[in-house]
């Protein structure tokens, strides 16, 4: 009986550790996706989006690159 309880406790610890590492990996992936603000090529206008640090807005009215002030 003690062996079964020890095995069950060990299984809970292993599953919890795997779950925590997977959750951390997904959080880091989400942060990387949210942090990626690289402008993509404009579809409507056919030119590249402006750099937000230099030009402010990217490409207002295009299908891909729209900054917050353009929405």
From Swiss-Prot:
Coiled coil: none annotated. Expressed by the venom gland. It is found in: Secreted. Keywords: Disulfide bond, Ion channel impairing toxin, Knottin, Neurotoxin, Secreted, Signal, Toxin. Its main location: secreted. Residues 21-35 form a propeptide. GO terms for molecular function: ion channel regulator activity; toxin activity. Disulfide bonds join 42-60, 49-65, 59-70. GO terms for cellular component: extracellular region. Residues 1-20 form the signal peptide. Negative results: does not show activity on 45 human receptors from 9 families (5-hydroxytryptamine, adrenergic, dopamine, muscarinic, histamine, neurotransmitter, opioid, sigma, and gaba(A) receptors). Probable insect neurotoxin with ion channel impairing activity. Does not show activity on 45 human receptors from 9 families (5-hydroxytryptamine, adrenergic, dopamine, muscarinic, histamine, neurotransmitter, opioid, sigma, and gaba(A) receptors). In vivo, does not cause paralytic or lethal activity when injected into sheep blowflies or crickets. It is noteworthy that both sheep blowflies and crickets are evolutionarily distant from prey species. The presence of a 'disulfide through disulfide knot' structurally defines this protein as a knottin. This is U5-scytotoxin-Sth1a. The lineage of its organism: Eukaryota, Metazoa, Ecdysozoa, Arthropoda, Chelicerata.
């Amino acid at each position: 009986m003690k062996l079964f309880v020890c095995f069950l406790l060990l299984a809970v610890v292993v599953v919890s550790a795997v779950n925590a590492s997977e959750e951390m990996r997904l959080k880091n992936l989400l942060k990387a996706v949210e942090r990626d603000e690289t402008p993509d090529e404009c579809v409507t206008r056919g030119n590249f989006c402006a750099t937000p640090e230099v030009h402010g807005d990217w490409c207002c009215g295009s299908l891909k690159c729209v900054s917050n002030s353009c929405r």
